[in-house]
Amino acid sequence: MLTVLITISACGPKKEYLSPLEIEKEKEKVIEVIKEYQVAYDEKNFGKVVETLADDVIFFGTDSSEVIKTFADFKKAIEKQWQEYDKIIYGEMRDVSIQMDDQGTLASIIFGTNADFIVGTDTSNYYLRIARVLKKSNEKWLIVSGIVGIVRPDEHYGAIQEPETP
Protein backbone atom coordinates (compact mmCIF):
# COMPACT_ATOMS: atom_id res chain seq x y z
CA MET A 1 0.00 0.00 0.00
CA LEU A 2 2.81 2.42 0.88
CA THR A 3 4.44 1.73 -2.49
CA VAL A 4 1.19 2.61 -4.28
CA LEU A 5 0.90 5.92 -2.38
CA ILE A 6 4.51 6.85 -3.11
CA THR A 7 4.03 6.02 -6.78
CA ILE A 8 0.81 8.05 -7.01
CA SER A 9 2.32 11.08 -5.30
CA ALA A 10 5.45 10.88 -7.45
CA CYS A 11 3.35 10.75 -10.63
CA GLY A 12 1.08 13.62 -9.59
CA PRO A 13 1.46 17.10 -11.00
CA LYS A 14 4.52 18.86 -9.68
CA LYS A 15 4.60 22.54 -8.95
CA GLU A 16 6.90 24.42 -11.24
CA TYR A 17 9.03 26.99 -9.50
CA LEU A 18 10.49 29.92 -11.38
CA SER A 19 14.16 30.81 -11.26
CA PRO A 20 15.15 34.19 -9.80
CA LEU A 21 15.71 35.47 -13.36
CA GLU A 22 12.24 34.29 -14.42
CA ILE A 23 10.73 35.97 -11.34
CA GLU A 24 12.43 39.25 -12.32
CA LYS A 25 11.00 38.99 -15.85
CA GLU A 26 7.53 38.40 -14.40
CA LYS A 27 7.94 41.43 -12.13
CA GLU A 28 8.72 43.54 -15.21
CA LYS A 29 5.48 42.27 -16.77
CA VAL A 30 3.59 43.30 -13.61
CA ILE A 31 5.00 46.83 -13.93
CA GLU A 32 3.95 46.89 -17.61
CA VAL A 33 0.34 46.08 -16.63
CA ILE A 34 0.34 48.82 -13.98
CA LYS A 35 1.60 51.33 -16.55
CA GLU A 36 -1.02 50.16 -19.09
CA TYR A 37 -3.69 50.72 -16.44
CA GLN A 38 -2.39 54.22 -15.68
CA VAL A 39 -2.27 55.20 -19.38
CA ALA A 40 -5.81 53.89 -19.95
CA TYR A 41 -7.00 55.70 -16.82
CA ASP A 42 -5.36 58.95 -17.94
CA GLU A 43 -6.89 58.60 -21.42
CA LYS A 44 -10.30 57.92 -19.82
CA ASN A 45 -10.52 54.72 -21.85
CA PHE A 46 -12.70 52.32 -19.86
CA GLY A 47 -12.27 49.49 -22.40
CA LYS A 48 -8.48 49.59 -22.01
CA VAL A 49 -8.77 49.82 -18.22
CA VAL A 50 -10.91 46.66 -18.19
CA GLU A 51 -8.26 44.81 -20.24
CA THR A 52 -5.92 45.10 -17.24
CA LEU A 53 -8.47 43.73 -14.74
CA ALA A 54 -9.39 40.22 -13.65
CA ASP A 55 -13.01 39.05 -13.82
CA ASP A 56 -13.43 39.58 -10.06
CA VAL A 57 -12.00 42.79 -8.64
CA ILE A 58 -12.19 44.81 -5.45
CA PHE A 59 -10.96 48.37 -5.08
CA PHE A 60 -10.82 50.67 -2.08
CA GLY A 61 -10.95 54.36 -2.92
CA THR A 62 -9.71 57.37 -1.02
CA ASP A 63 -13.24 57.94 0.29
CA SER A 64 -13.89 55.66 3.28
CA SER A 65 -17.22 54.54 1.83
CA GLU A 66 -15.74 53.69 -1.56
CA VAL A 67 -15.52 49.90 -1.77
CA ILE A 68 -15.94 48.66 -5.32
CA LYS A 69 -16.71 45.01 -5.97
CA THR A 70 -18.46 44.94 -9.37
CA PHE A 71 -17.60 46.25 -12.82
CA ALA A 72 -20.80 48.31 -12.78
CA ASP A 73 -19.72 50.03 -9.54
CA PHE A 74 -16.19 50.39 -10.89
CA LYS A 75 -17.40 52.04 -14.09
CA LYS A 76 -19.69 54.38 -12.15
CA ALA A 77 -16.87 55.43 -9.80
CA ILE A 78 -14.38 55.94 -12.62
CA GLU A 79 -16.78 57.96 -14.74
CA LYS A 80 -17.50 60.18 -11.72
CA GLN A 81 -13.77 60.69 -11.15
CA TRP A 82 -13.15 61.37 -14.84
CA GLN A 83 -15.63 64.27 -14.69
CA GLU A 84 -13.59 65.93 -11.93
CA TYR A 85 -10.44 66.59 -14.01
CA ASP A 86 -9.32 67.02 -17.61
CA LYS A 87 -6.10 65.04 -17.45
CA ILE A 88 -3.75 63.22 -15.09
CA ILE A 89 -0.04 63.10 -15.70
CA TYR A 90 1.67 60.38 -13.66
CA GLY A 91 5.32 60.66 -12.69
CA GLU A 92 7.78 57.80 -12.52
CA MET A 93 7.02 54.93 -10.18
CA ARG A 94 9.16 55.20 -7.03
CA ASP A 95 9.98 52.91 -4.15
CA VAL A 96 8.56 49.98 -6.11
CA SER A 97 8.23 46.77 -4.12
CA ILE A 98 6.90 43.61 -5.74
CA GLN A 99 6.33 40.38 -3.87
CA MET A 100 5.61 37.28 -5.92
CA ASP A 101 4.98 33.62 -5.24
CA ASP A 102 7.63 31.13 -6.43
CA GLN A 103 5.42 29.93 -9.26
CA GLY A 104 4.82 33.39 -10.71
CA THR A 105 1.04 33.30 -10.41
CA LEU A 106 0.29 35.91 -7.73
CA ALA A 107 1.97 39.28 -7.17
CA SER A 108 1.61 42.27 -4.90
CA ILE A 109 3.01 45.65 -5.91
CA ILE A 110 3.23 48.85 -3.90
CA PHE A 111 4.75 52.08 -5.14
CA GLY A 112 4.60 55.84 -4.98
CA THR A 113 4.19 58.33 -7.81
CA ASN A 114 3.54 62.00 -8.35
CA ALA A 115 0.33 62.80 -10.18
CA ASP A 116 -0.62 66.13 -11.71
CA PHE A 117 -4.39 66.56 -11.89
CA ILE A 118 -5.23 69.17 -14.52
CA VAL A 119 -8.55 71.01 -14.52
CA GLY A 120 -8.70 73.75 -17.15
CA THR A 121 -5.60 75.86 -16.56
CA ASP A 122 -5.15 74.73 -12.94
CA THR A 123 -2.81 71.93 -11.93
CA SER A 124 -2.78 70.20 -8.55
CA ASN A 125 0.10 67.90 -7.69
CA TYR A 126 -0.31 64.98 -5.32
CA TYR A 127 1.94 62.17 -4.21
CA LEU A 128 0.07 58.88 -4.41
CA ARG A 129 0.82 55.57 -2.76
CA ILE A 130 -0.69 52.75 -4.75
CA ALA A 131 -1.02 49.05 -3.93
CA ARG A 132 -2.27 46.39 -6.32
CA VAL A 133 -2.60 42.63 -6.24
CA LEU A 134 -2.35 40.82 -9.56
CA LYS A 135 -2.84 37.23 -10.63
CA LYS A 136 -1.62 35.53 -13.75
CA SER A 137 -4.39 34.13 -15.91
CA ASN A 138 -3.79 32.59 -19.34
CA GLU A 139 -0.21 33.90 -19.33
CA LYS A 140 -1.36 37.48 -18.64
CA TRP A 141 -1.09 39.48 -15.41
CA LEU A 142 -4.41 41.00 -14.31
CA ILE A 143 -5.26 43.35 -11.44
CA VAL A 144 -7.55 41.76 -8.85
CA SER A 145 -7.50 44.46 -6.16
CA GLY A 146 -6.16 47.86 -5.38
CA ILE A 147 -6.06 50.83 -3.10
CA VAL A 148 -4.78 54.38 -3.60
CA GLY A 149 -3.82 56.80 -0.87
CA ILE A 150 -3.02 60.48 -1.19
CA VAL A 151 -0.03 61.36 0.96
CA ARG A 152 -0.57 64.31 3.26
CA PRO A 153 2.28 66.79 3.69
CA ASP A 154 4.13 66.34 6.98
CA GLU A 155 3.43 69.90 8.15
CA HIS A 156 -0.32 69.39 7.68
CA TYR A 157 -0.25 66.10 9.56
CA GLY A 158 1.81 67.59 12.39
CA ALA A 159 -0.65 70.44 12.79
CA ILE A 160 -3.48 67.97 13.22
CA GLN A 161 -1.65 65.78 15.73
CA GLU A 162 -0.07 68.39 17.99
CA PRO A 163 -2.31 69.51 20.86
CA GLU A 164 -2.37 73.19 21.69
CA THR A 165 -0.60 74.24 24.87
CA PRO A 166 -2.61 76.33 27.30
Descriptions of predicted regions:
Residues G12-K15, Y127-Y157:
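Short beta-strand edge/turn micro-motifs at domain boundaries
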Residues C11-E51, Q161-T165:
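Short, low-complexity N-terminal intrinsically disordered segments enriched in polar/charged residues
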Residues P20-I23, Q38-V39, T62-V67, G120:
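Second-shell loop/turn segments in exported
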Residues M1-I8:
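Bacterial N-terminal signal peptides
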Residues L53, D63, D102, F111-T113, ...:
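A mature extracytoplasmic/lumenal domain signature
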Residues K75-G120:
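Surface-exposed, charged secondary-structure patches
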Residues Y37, V49-V50, V57, F74, ...:
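Hydrophobic pocket/interface hotspot
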